[in-house]
Amino acid sequence: MNANTPVTIVMIEDDEGHARLIERNIRRSGVNNEIIPFSNGTDAMKHLFGSDGTGIQHKGRALLILLDLNLPDMTGIDILRQIKENKYLKTAPVVVLTTTDDSQEIKRCYELGCNVYITKPVNYESFANAIRQLGLFFSVIQVPPACSS
């Protein structure tokens, strides 16, 4: 991944109204990157991990994952854990967007590796600021090339 690699936003949100609002807020904050929406965890996991289950197709790609914790088919916690345990996906920033403001769940998400935890309904300014900060992160990060032997 380099500074010219466009960031793809993967949005995992089962509520269609929330998904539209999130996308609108992203666009209002000036972000025009591709957004790939998923309404359930199963389809999102197939996309993230691919048909072989390794996630290798995302090697070198810049991803930003927006994750709801309350999905119809699996928990966002399980998705977060699997993303952060995968060698190709673990560096992708994960923004948790959920209605749950339980302090234990928030702590657990941060322990598993989420980068930002935002409680719905989303405060537009907080959300836009988080997205802008993550965009800045992507624009300044440089991954050193692999050493050849």
Pin down the residues of each PLM region.
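Conserved phosphotransfer cores of two-component systems
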Residues: I56-G60, K84-T91, L112
